[in-house]
Each structure stands twice: as structure tokens, then as C-alpha cells.
Amino acid sequence: MNVLLLGSGGREHALAWKIAASPLLTKLYAAPGNPGIGAEAELVKLDITDHAAVTAFCQEKKIDLVVVGPEGPLVAGIADDLRAENIRVFGPSKAAARLEGSKGFTKDLCARYNIPTAAYGRFNDLASAKAYVDQTGAPIVIKADGLAAGKGVTVAMTSDEARAALDACFEGSFGAAGAEVVVEEFMTGEEASFFCLCDGTTALPFGTAQDHKRVGDGDVGPNTGGMGAYSPAPVMTPEMIERTMREIIEPTMRGMAELGAPFAGILFAGLMITDKGPKLIEYNTRFGDPECQVLMMRLKDDLLVLLNAAVDGQLAHTSIRWRDEAALTVVMAARGYPGTPEKGSVIRGVEQAAGEGVQIFHAGTAINGGALVANGGRVLNVTASGATVGEAQKRAYAALDRIDWPDGFCRRDIGWQAVARERAS
């Protein structure tokens, strides 16, 4: 099979690594990719926002499957444009990608199908939103409706903070994404990420993870796209997975089909596990980053076989096998992240750091004058497996400490909740 992978992050490097291991693969292309992905695939200078150019490339190279990594192209309808030319693609249609592209759409779907989630209001004017905040009180959560690269959510502990977040949305801090907002109740519990592989009709559980959103040790500082993750998530017991499928995933699949937008691709549910059970925080319509990296470390099966089954509507006849071990990834970021990251600093020792049970996935990297340099905010993902989360953590940090990059930083406590649980038991 000839496969084209779209994207350039650590998530896409993990997907490329796993796809490259498949006996089904003839040739893997990636656009635009990064130096790490370049070790697994031929990099192509394609503008992935130019759907006609992507389509033409697929026709020229006889691409059998396109795998879409990031959310932007999906929400923009790249899967529809490729399917219109009879090109097989793993990823939801534009209509189905609204589950990520519009938080308000998803909240309304939850209300219609009795899917447990936080109480909410949808607003497209500042005065009404502020009135709702004043009436409800804090703590309260403010979300830009559209795509904001994981940075459009404010957990406001005071009404003043909530009002400032609303001002930011309506003043254009998130562009068109903030033209409408969702204001919702503050939920308490433990967060978890739950993934399903979907073919429009069937949804199969595809692993659990927990990530660390805040930039600093001890979960302090501003939110990021994610500073690390581990899998599996201890809070997602077999009973909790069964409830999540029954109460959240299956009604969503049914609802989307009834709306004429059956969901096929990866459905990523951000959950709050409360004392009353699982509640939906939000949906993403692609693999998480950095959650994908730990899932790929644990996946025993051939990823390409599973993606084909999803594209061909064959998941009812498919099962998924996992390695009986944990995985943990630590994000190395450039100084200045999540604000304006410093680019161009040289990174040494990456090859020497990888080893048995350790993979280093590239995100914001580039080659400059033969040297590996930082070229983004989140730059490397040091990913390790182990019998326990604690063992994976030890391996990951030992590898990370072999990387020579004075201008990079990371959190030193990724996996702390799970490790504390393991020690207590």
C-alpha cells in the first residue's frame, strides 16, 4: 500500500513509526513532516490546506490511503474532498468533524441524546454571556466555540476571571473561533482521555491515557497543548470503559448517524470521572498529541490493518490487542513556550538517548546546517514503555537526561498521579 500521512507533530511521527512497521506498506509519504518523520517516510513539500494539491499528489503517486493527523484539515473538509475523487482517507467528514470544530454543536448533541456533560449556555454576544456568568457564579468554564489549538479554554476561579476570558474571546484573541462561546459549569473529578476507532457504525475502544496540560510541575501555570501523558489511565477501569461506551460513545455514534454525518475516524473523548460516573468534557476528532505517542508504544496490532478496517466499515469483525505494559511520554519544549518559543537552538544527543523500550518522537524540529534545531514550541517527545507507569517514567527521564539541549525544558513530574497510586497499592 502507498500511504500519505498529513501533519508534522509528535503525533504524526508516532503514527509514521507505527505505519512504517506494517508489512502491508509499500511506500509512506508525509506532508509536511519533520526530520524525525523523515526517517520513516519520504517528506513531501505539500501545503495540506490546499486540498486540490493534496488530491493531485494522491492521484499522481497512486495513494491507497491518506491518514490525516491534525484537526485543522478535517474541520476544513479535506476528507470529503479526497473521497469525492475516490481516494480512501482515514478521518471524519467535515460534518462529523464538527464534534471538535464547534463546542456548541457537541453540547447541543449531548442535550439531545442525554449524554452526561456539564450544564452550559451558548452565546454569541458579550452581554448575554456575562449575564449568565453573573447569574451562575464561579468557578465556571469559558470555551471559545471553534478551534483554538487547545488554548481556547479558561477555567475561571472568580467571576472577574470569567469576565476577562469572555472579553478576550469577543475581542478576537482567538479569531473566528471566539465569535461564539460556551459557558459551562465547573466539574470536579479526575480527567481522562478515552479513544475509539470508528467506522461510521461501530466504535471500538482504542485505549486510555491521561495528559498533563499545564506547563509547570505540580500542574501550575498556563495551559499548553500537553506536556506529557501516560497510558493506560488507572481511573478507566473495565467498568468505567463499559459505562463510557454505553452512556457517551454509543449515543454519539447514533446521534451523528441520525444527523446524516456518521462518524468514521478516531473519536477522542475528554472525560471527567465524577462520583456519578463519566461526563464528557469535549470531543476531538483525531488522535491526541501527546496521547497518540503512548498509545502507539502500547499497540500490539498492525496499525495499518486497523485503519483499513475503519475506512472499509469492517470494525464489527475486528479486535484490538495491546501490550501488557504502560507507556509514558515527556514533552521537551523550547524556552518561551507556551508563549513565543525561542527557535533555532541546537539539540544534540537525540540518537544516543533512544534505546530499548524508548522512542524519541520529533515535533517542532528542523535541520539547519546539518544540525538538529528547535523549530516550534513542543519540540521532542521522549517516550518509554515499562511494566508499570513508574518504570516507564524512570526510563523516559533517564533517556531525556542524555539529550543535550540547554535551551529546552520539561516537566519533571509526568505520571505523578499514577506513580503515587502504584506506590500506595
UniProtKB/Swiss-Prot annotation:
Binding residues for ATP: 133-193
Region described as Disordered: 214-233
Domain ATP-grasp, first and last residues per copy: 107-312
Cofactor(s) this protein cannot do without: Mg(2+); Mn(2+)
Signal peptide annotation: none
Keywords assigned by UniProt, alphabetized: ATP-binding, Ligase, Magnesium, Manganese, Metal-binding, Nucleotide-binding, Purine biosynthesis
Name under which the protein is recorded: Phosphoribosylamine--glycine ligase
Gene: purD
